[in-house]
Amino acid sequence: MPCSLETRSPQGLSANIQDLAFHGSIAVQPLALTASSLVTCLGAGREANASALRTRRTGLAPCAFETVTLDTCVGEVRGVDDVRVPDRLRNFDCRNNRMAQLGLEIDGFSNAVIAARDRYGPGRIGVFLGTSTSGILETELGYRKRDAEGRLPPDFHYRETHNTYSLADYVRHAFELSGPAVVVSAACASSAKVFGSAARAIAVGLCDAAVVGGVDSLCLTALYGFHSLGLLSPHPCRPFDAARDGISISEGAGFVLLEKPQHAASPARVHLLGVG
């Protein structure tokens, strides 16, 4: 999990934000989070999510996703099917990349990345994203349309949808970036680990800024897989309740833009001080 790390001088005084923090064995400068976006079942945008948390409103509801007939609650993001990817990226069209597009468009995040691209150059911005199942739903849907020989339909594009890397590939094409692009798929730790990957890349000079975050979308594999393990709750999950009885599967997207503080267009209120 990401965690802050405060550095101190030999005299015990707190160091300022420009002092070094440590990531593994690499000393790096703290990185500024200059833009961010968030889409969950609570709503689209940071404010919608904050409002739901303040009013204790849940986004979990009885599952009505696709053909699923499980007695469980899910956190489905409304409106994903209405999102349209750019025409030039139509081969990437799948629920996971539409979820990504929704996250890129909200909270002014897209404008911030474009401004950074203009400032640093497209080859100096990296993309470091986490996902667990990527666009596997597209394969699940395509499987229903196999021909007599078992072939998937001709409009199915594995590389741009189901392939785990398709998420980073979609985002880099969406912003026309040519810096390093990485996807980490390590279950629930995926979106935490990419902060470390981005910090390392900036520290060693591979890029000057990075789009960092994660996207996951509902799919039959995750729902039926966790059901087969007996882990799904029939109610909205209550992880800290003595009577807790399982988990609830959800979906969403979250992005941040990481930059060195001295190069950011404006001062940031939040900084990444370390990962461990």
Pin down the residues of each PLM region.
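A glycine- and small-aliphatic-rich helix-loop capping segment at beta-alpha/alpha-beta transitions
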Residues: E47-S51, E140-L152, V171, A201-V204, ...
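Condensing-enzyme catalytic core mediating Claisen C-C bond formation in acyl metabolism
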Residues: P30-T34, R46, A52-V74, P236-G276
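Active-site nucleophile and cofactor-binding loops and adjacent substrate-binding regions
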Residues: T67, M99-G103, H157-Y165, V182-S190, ...
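Conserved active-site "lid/cap" helical segment
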Residues: H23-I26, L42, E47-L129, G135-E138
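Acyl-CoA/ACP chain-elongation machinery
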Residues: L206-S228, S233-R244, V275
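Active-site-proximal gating segment of KS-fold condensing enzymes and close homologs
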Residues: T131-V182
